[in-house]
Design a protein with these regions (language model features):
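RecB-family 4Fe-4S metal-dependent nuclease core
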Residues: 1-297
Length: 297
């Protein structure tokens, strides 16, 4: 997976990302614990669901047109062991087979028309003076045209919750060329690929692959509105007086709480306030679990 290194920027210039913004929009309390005070939990989070996606990503990032498929299967086997993926529950091999079909259709054919392929790269740029970064699973670039693909490991292909993330990427890549909103919407295409999605109506493997790829349609107005919303969210975050916030009122429990390390967390003497919203719903953290501040580098 890519490691971002931006040593040129001063240390007081914080990086923003789609995930950081979505964390705040989803739950301001989790944002506070993750980005403001950086509280960490002694209990290792359950990453079972995420590991299947990581296993896939860290396998396919090695692929290039013309590479023997057998080599990628070898990498997949090692990644399955590394992440202890339950292959009876998550069919990584079937996902890889679908990936090969995807690559032939969307990547290899594009390369024949002049597109250059970049896997696991970065997009970065400024939005209203705020520095944003984003990790790109796959970017096809011809200079005058760009295609961005993001891999998702969900069973159901859904565009809505990832749309803002991909729109941000399109803006950052277009900004590198000095394109305006109209030029970006004309020249940057956005796609989501769901290699593990269930396709019950598609007949052939090719059909299932095609049904697993979703294009995000947008125009200049949609893109501009999205970027403005990002900037408005940042201003809202900066307007918080975090040191004097009523943290009990910040929690926003929803389905995502099941993956949150702060679910059911109790206050401690070190200043950790826990999550009252999740405790009120009956969630209780185990007694042995503790919370501590992440050490500053």
């Amino acid at each position: 997976m890519p490691q971002y290194n931006d040593s040129v920027r001063s240390s007081d210039k914080q990086n923003w990302s789609a995930s950081r913004i979505s964390t705040y929009r989803q739950c301001p309390l989790k944002y506070y614990y993750t980005y403001v005070k950086k509280w960490r939990c002694s209990k290792a989070p359950d990453t079972t669901a995420a590991d299947k996606g990581t296993c896939f990503h860290e396998t396919v990032e090695h692929f290039k047109t013309g590479m023997e498929h057998a080599k990628l299967y070898e990498i997949l086997e090692s990644k399955i062991k590394e992440y202890n993926v339950d292959t009876t529950k998550y069919d990584e091999k079937a996902a890889l087979e679908r990936f090969f079909l995807f690559w032939n259709e969307f990547v290899a054919k594009s390369e024949l028309t002049g597109f250059k392929t970049l896997q696991e790269g970065w997009a970065s740029g400024d939005l209203g003076g705020e520095h944003f970064i984003g990790a790109l699973d796959l970017c096809l670039d011809r200079g005058d045209r760009i295609k961005i693909f993001d891999y998702k490991s969900g069973k159901t292909p859904s565009i809505s919750k990832y749309k803002d993330q991909l729109l941000l990427y399109s803006y950052l890549k277009g900004q590198e060329r000095g394109w305006d909103f109209q030029q970006i919407s004309d020249n940057v295409k956005l796609y989501l690929f769901f290699p593990m999605s269930e396709q019950k109506t598609a007949v052939t493997d090719e059909d299932k692959m095609l049904a697993s790829v979703k294009e995000i349609k947008y125009d200049a107005t949609v893109l501009q509105d999205c970027i403005n919303n990002y900037l408005e969210t940042i201003q809202e975050i900066k307007a918080h007086d975090w040191e004097n916030e009523d943290l009990d009122a910040l929690g926003c429990p929803d389905f995502a709480c099941c993956w949150c390390e702060h679910k059911g967390g109790n206050p401690n003497a070190e200043g950790y306030k826990g999550c009252k919203a999740s405790r009120d719903l009956g969630n209780v953290q185990e007694r042995y679990v503790t919370y501590h501040l992440k050490e500053s580098k």
